């Protein structure tokens, strides 16, 4: 119904963003809302997908079309709902997920919250050969670049975002120690690093 929404980014929360367009504020669930941080109070285009349930109409949003397409592919897999698909895309780029699928790397897929061996195998069975990998070496899963020292407010926001993705306080306590030894320019960077540590 909504291919994308173009408007002003007015709110940034661990699980969603709010975009105001034509006087209406759209609450949009995102894999990692802090990817939109640089657009705060500025115009942004969010690629969206509306999912209607018996009890709710939920709008999901993505930083680009590739991320949206990967989300739509994932939720077609038996056992994968929107929440699990968002958790996967919060923890990894669409291309890394595609590479894991094509390489039948079940171990990589089971590192995401809520994805067990059976579901990981189902993802591979359903999507292998149906996803387009970008021009990279498909024998490797790419890692996100990280930085070096700590910033408490950023780390605090990042931990809230990770908790919203379904990670336990016990897991986050371990990650917090590692994050505190590094520094980050943005919450997005800290979230990405935290996700790397959690799925390592």
Swiss-Prot record:
CDD domains in the record: UBA_RuvA_C
InterPro entries: DNA_helicase_Holl-junc_RuvA_I (IPR013849), Hlx-hairpin-Hlx_DNA-bd_motif (IPR003583), NA-bd_OB-fold (IPR012340), RuvA (IPR000085), RuvA_2-like (IPR010994), RuvA_C (IPR011114), RuvA_C_sf (IPR036267)
Domain writeup: Has three domains with a flexible linker between the domains II and III and assumes an 'L' shape. Domain III is highly mobile and contacts RuvB.
Region (Flexible linker): 143-149
SUPFAM superfamilies named in the record: DNA helicase RuvA subunit, C-terminal domain (SSF46929), Nucleic acid-binding proteins (SSF50249), RuvA domain 2-like (SSF47781)
Location within or outside the cell: Cytoplasm
Gene this protein is translated from: ruvA
Similarity annotation: Belongs to the RuvA family.
Pfam families (alphabetical): HHH_5, RuvA_C, RuvA_N
Alphabetized UniProt keyword annotations: Cytoplasm, DNA damage, DNA recombination, DNA repair, DNA-binding
Main location: cytoplasm
Superkingdom of origin organism: Bacteria
Organism in which the protein naturally occurs: Staphylococcus saprophyticus subsp. saprophyticus (strain ATCC 15305 / DSM 20229 / NCIMB 8711 / NCTC 7292 / S-41)
Keyword DNA-binding assigned: yes
Subunit note: Homotetramer. Forms an RuvA(8)-RuvB(12)-Holliday junction (HJ) complex. HJ DNA is sandwiched between 2 RuvA tetramers; dsDNA enters through RuvA and exits via RuvB. An RuvB hexamer assembles on each DNA strand where it exits the tetramer. Each RuvB hexamer is contacted by two RuvA subunits (via domain III) on 2 adjacent RuvB subunits; this complex drives branch migration. In the full resolvosome a probable DNA-RuvA(4)-RuvB(12)-RuvC(2) complex forms which resolves the HJ.
Entry-linked Gene3D superfamilies: 5' to 3' exonuclease, C-terminal subdomain, Nucleic acid-binding proteins
Cellular compartments per GO CC: cytoplasm; Holliday junction helicase complex; Holliday junction resolvase complex
GO biological process: DNA recombination; DNA repair
Name of the protein described by the UniProt record: Holliday junction branch migration complex subunit RuvA
Annotated region described as Domain III, given as residue ranges: 150-200
UniProt-annotated stretches for the region Domain I: 1-63
GO molecular function: ATP binding; four-way junction DNA binding; four-way junction helicase activity
Function: The RuvA-RuvB-RuvC complex processes Holliday junction (HJ) DNA during genetic recombination and DNA repair, while the RuvA-RuvB complex plays an important role in the rescue of blocked DNA replication forks via replication fork reversal (RFR). RuvA specifically binds to HJ cruciform DNA, conferring on it an open structure. The RuvB hexamer acts as an ATP-dependent pump, pulling dsDNA into and through the RuvAB complex. HJ branch migration allows RuvC to scan DNA until it finds its consensus sequence, where it cleaves and resolves the cruciform DNA.
Region span, Domain II: 64-142
């Amino acid at each position: 119904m909504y291919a994308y929404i173009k408007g002003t980014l007015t709110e940034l929360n661990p699980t969603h963003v709010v975009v105001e367009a034509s006087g209406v504020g759209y609450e949009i669930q995102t894999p990692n809302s802090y990817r939109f941080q640089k657009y705060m109070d500025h115009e942004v285009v969010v690629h969206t997908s509306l999912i209607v349930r018996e009890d709710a109409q939920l709008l999901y949003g993505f930083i680009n079309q590739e991320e949206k397409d990967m989300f739509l592919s994932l939720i077609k897999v038996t056992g994968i709902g929107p929440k699990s698909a968002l958790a996967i895309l919060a923890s990894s780029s669409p291309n890394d997920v595609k590479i894991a699928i094509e390489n039948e790397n079940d171990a990589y897929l089971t590192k995401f919250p809520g994805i067990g061996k059976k579901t990981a195998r189902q993802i591979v069975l359903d999507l292998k050969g149906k996803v387009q990998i970008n021009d990279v070496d498909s024998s490797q899963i790419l890692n996100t670049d990280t930085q070096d020292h700590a910033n408490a407010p950023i780390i605090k926001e990042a931990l809230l975002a990770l908790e919203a993705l379904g990670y336990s306080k016990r897991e986050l306590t371990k990650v917090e120690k590692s994050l505190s030894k590094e520094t980050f320019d943005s919450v997005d960077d800290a979230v990405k690093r935290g996700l790397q540590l959690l799925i390592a």
